[in-house]
A protein has these predicted regions:
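Vicinal oxygen chelate
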Residues: 1-2, 5-15, 34-36, 43-50, 54-55, 67-89, 93, ...
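Long, hydrophobic N-terminal alpha-helical segment
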Residues: 1-40
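Residues that cap or initiate secondary-structure elements
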Residues: 17, 53, 62, 86-88, ...
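A short, acidic/glycine-rich surface segment
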Residues: 32-33, 63-68
Length: 134
């Protein structure tokens, strides 16, 4: 059995500033200011409440990796990010358990450049895997 820790819940938003304000009104605090991810063409902001972390993700262009998802699903949670101490081994284990990589592991600017990979599973949807230590 994998021993993965939940790092955050990814939340798609159309308007970053409005989403930040709404989450702050719910008692969240900004954990990390908004960061632009040039590879994925998204703005990212981390907020925290009661030990839970959410990642607000907003596309900045029509060819962003999440622009299509936002059009289809609107503002909504869309992935769970899991933290691992053994990225390569857990990545391969997830593959054998039916998770399909959407992309190759790449550095994430909003996560101190740590490698992340997004994967999908027919029964679970999308997850993100990240090296621990963030």
């Amino acid at each position: 059995m994998l021993m993965l820790k939940v790092h955050h819940i990814g939340y798609l938003v159309k308007k970053m500033d409005a989403a930040i304000l709404s989450f702050k009104n719910l008692g969240y605090r900004i954990k990390q200011d908004t960061v632009y991810d040039e590879i994925r063409k998204i703005n990212i902001c981390f907020l925290e409440k009661d030990g839970y972390c959410i990642e607000l993700v907003s596309p900045v262009s029509e060819d962003s990796v999440v622009a299509g998802l936002l059009k289809k699903y609107k503002n909504c949670p869309y992935h769970i990010c899991y933290e691992t101490t053994d990225f390569e081994t857990d990545f391969e284990t997830l593959r054998t358990e039916g998770f399909m990589p959407i992309d190759t592991p790449t550095p994430a600017p909003a996560l101190s450049g740590k490698e992340v990979v997004f994967m999908t599973h027919a029964a679970l949807g999308m997850i993100e895997l990240i090296k621990s230590g963030i």
